[in-house]
């Protein structure tokens, strides 16, 4: 997710944001100057395999930002599987037809509550604005 987009659109403080390690201490310092920030877990551990249920229990929906967004392939990382395992509603900023593929594989999504037409948008930036 583009943190600058979140900050410019006043979305940074609207929920919980998870991210990996910063590339440098300077990046962390810059981010901490821009907004109140709370780090509730160490960034020295790879949390890819962990599912933190309290995070899902304290939020209404997950915005999943996939690692690789490419129009030529369908890529799904652990990021999409975490809310699925937790039974948590989600929107995915990923490749075209990610939701469609999940449905084809038998997964149920939250289409009764979420307009999933964004899944058909091939332009990453248009999809980000829609979301």
Feature map (PLM): residue ranges:
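Pol beta-like nucleotidyltransferase catalytic core
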Residues: 1-64, 70-77, 81-131
């Amino acid at each position: 997710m583009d943190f600058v987009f979140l900050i410019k659109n006043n979305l940074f403080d609207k929920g919980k944001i998870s991210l990996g390690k910063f590339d440098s201490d300077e990046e962390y310092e810059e981010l901490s100057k821009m907004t109140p920030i709370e780090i509730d877990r160490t960034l020295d551990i790879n949390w890819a395999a962990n599912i933190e249920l309290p995070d899902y229990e304290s939020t209404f929906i997950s915005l999943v930002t996939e690692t690789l967004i490419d129009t030529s392939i369908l890529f799904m990382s652990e990021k999409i599987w975490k809310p699925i395992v937790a039974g948590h509603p989600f929107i995915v900023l990923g490749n075209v037809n990610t939701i469609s593929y999940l449905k084809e594989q038998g997964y149920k999504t939250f289409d009764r509550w979420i307009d999933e037409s964004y899944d058909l948008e091939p332009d990453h930036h248009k999809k980000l604005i829609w979301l």
